[in-house]
């Protein structure tokens, strides 16, 4: 993780630059002006990862980060204003615990995961085996800090408490509860994530047909969108994300979603009847009356075959973490679909990265 340049006084200008950049990328497709969803200026990031750096000639260690492309010049961190208040509160208390050799010896990396609901999990990574002595010290530390702890060393993982955090997000007046596993992808900016969910919920609208969701992750969007349609078929390839999504569906009593562990490419093959999949044995694909598809792909965007799959749907709701590949995908779809809504979500203040969303509807 590289360190963003934190400068709240520059936030408005940087956000305007992102808005102009997104509008420029979508201009060839006659897109409407993007709706803009701002981030808090500080304490917005719910995750943080630090290396540990030892001062030359003594045993004093610091949290450290590095500029992108430079892994040899550490930036020593005492506090981290872009991270959640909970992370900033935990950082010095955890640092004091390194004095215990059971916890501090050959510790090289620390990862914090927190939620808007106040939950916290810390992962400690070691260049040595961890054992029962580590567990005993970790149990004491977890109780003192009020957190869950995970220890990692080569080939070993010890969990103290839970290996996930619990989040609560509000969409259209309803609260949704989420388990967010250690090591799995979660949206880093909780406040902006909540705004994204609300935008997607509104953009989809209330439907009497079915939704296909590709790349569903832990069910972040699945839960609120499932309340807008008759039923959902959702796909995800990561095993830990699938398990979290299934737990989240159960915890929220959402019973109109079928989740399958398939890639977007595999699902395309299944829908095209190119080949059967055992993981679809209990699902009747012909029973679905799909009107919409929701996609939240990785930075590479949708591959050409998945784009062609999306073309079949009346509505394509697309959340993107890379506006360049978003524009490439829209170029492939533009002859059959037009952009009726678009949005900029400032998930990553003080960086060039941006999250965006578009609703494409059949012409």
Swiss-Prot record:
<dbReference type="GO" id="GO:0005829">
    <property type="term" value="C:cytosol"/>
</dbReference>
<keyword id="KW-0808">Transferase</keyword>
<dbReference type="GO" id="GO:0000049">
    <property type="term" value="F:tRNA binding"/>
</dbReference>
<feature type="binding site">
    <location>
        <position position="187"/>
    </location>
    <ligand>
        <name>S-adenosyl-L-methionine</name>
    </ligand>
</feature>
<comment type="function">
    <text>Dual-specificity methyltransferase that catalyzes the formation of 5-methyluridine at position 54 (m5U54) in all tRNAs, and that of position 341 (m5U341) in tmRNA (transfer-mRNA).</text>
</comment>
<keyword id="KW-0819">tRNA processing</keyword>
<protein>
    <recommendedName>
        <fullName>tRNA/tmRNA (uracil-C(5))-methyltransferase</fullName>
        <ecNumber>2.1.1.-</ecNumber>
        <ecNumber>2.1.1.35</ecNumber>
    </recommendedName>
</protein>
<dbReference type="GO" id="GO:0030488">
    <property type="term" value="P:tRNA methylation"/>
</dbReference>
<dbReference type="InterPro" id="IPR011869">
    <property type="entry name" value="TrmA_MeTrfase"/>
</dbReference>
<keyword id="KW-0489">Methyltransferase</keyword>
<dbReference type="GO" id="GO:0030697">
    <property type="term" value="F:tRNA (uracil(54)-C5)-methyltransferase activity, S-adenosyl methionine-dependent"/>
</dbReference>
<dbReference type="InterPro" id="IPR010280">
    <property type="entry name" value="U5_MeTrfase_fam"/>
</dbReference>
<comment type="similarity">
    <text>Belongs to the class I-like SAM-binding methyltransferase superfamily. RNA M5U methyltransferase family. TrmA subfamily.</text>
</comment>
<keyword id="KW-0949">S-adenosyl-L-methionine</keyword>
<dbReference type="InterPro" id="IPR030391">
    <property type="entry name" value="MeTrfase_TrmA_CS"/>
</dbReference>
<feature type="binding site">
    <location>
        <position position="296"/>
    </location>
    <ligand>
        <name>S-adenosyl-L-methionine</name>
    </ligand>
</feature>
<feature type="active site" description="Proton acceptor">
    <location>
        <position position="355"/>
    </location>
</feature>
<feature type="binding site">
    <location>
        <position position="220"/>
    </location>
    <ligand>
        <name>S-adenosyl-L-methionine</name>
    </ligand>
</feature>
<feature type="binding site">
    <location>
        <position position="215"/>
    </location>
    <ligand>
        <name>S-adenosyl-L-methionine</name>
    </ligand>
</feature>
<dbReference type="GO" id="GO:0019843">
    <property type="term" value="F:rRNA binding"/>
</dbReference>
<dbReference type="Pfam" id="PF05958">
    <property type="entry name" value="tRNA_U5-meth_tr"/>
</dbReference>
<dbReference type="InterPro" id="IPR030390">
    <property type="entry name" value="MeTrfase_TrmA_AS"/>
</dbReference>
<dbReference type="InterPro" id="IPR029063">
    <property type="entry name" value="SAM-dependent_MTases_sf"/>
</dbReference>
<feature type="active site" description="Nucleophile">
    <location>
        <position position="321"/>
    </location>
</feature>
<feature type="binding site">
    <location>
        <position position="236"/>
    </location>
    <ligand>
        <name>S-adenosyl-L-methionine</name>
    </ligand>
</feature>
